[in-house]
Amino acid sequence: MDIKRSGDHVSRRGPSDYFTGAVQIDAPFNGSGALSGGTVTFDPGARTAWHTHPLGQTLLVVAGVGRVQREGGPVEQVRPGDIVWFEPGEKHWHGASATTAMQHLAINESLDGTAV
């Protein structure tokens, strides 16, 4: 068993190569094998760049109001308790609404050491 205590980790800013606006990444974890994830907090208007995941991505919205979009689809609003699944290779972005911050737990699997 491995317990990661709240406050025992170092927060980091989302790099500008992958995010627009202020984004904070907390509590990254690595599970068995290739599973990883973390809590990502987006300031109002902040979002990811368009990207894909080789084995897909699951988002669990925990706070605020967010927006998600897959390539060719409409922008969808998400709220706490909503779960979003992006298929492997599906081009998409996700982030906060224009006026409200959003926080989600992102869970990914890596393929050959790459999750994005």
Regions found by a protein language model. Name each.
Residues 32, 46, 68, 99-108:
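Ligand-binding pocket scaffold of soluble enzyme catalytic domains
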Residues 72-88:
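Short acidic-glycine-tyrosine-enriched beta hairpin
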Residues 48-50, 68-69, 86, 91-98:
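Short beta-strand His + acidic residue motifs that chelate non-heme Fe in jelly-roll/DSBH
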Residues 58, 85, 99-116:
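A short hydrophobic beta-strand segment most commonly corresponding to one strand
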Residues 22, 36-53, 88:
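Conserved short histidine dyad/triad with adjacent acidic residue
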Residues 1-35, 115-116:
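A short, N-terminal "cap"/entry segment at the start of jelly-roll beta-barrel domains
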Residues 74-77, 95, 99:
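Beta-rich strand-turn-strand
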Residues 39-43, 52-68, 107-110:
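Short, conserved beta-strand element in jelly-roll/cupin
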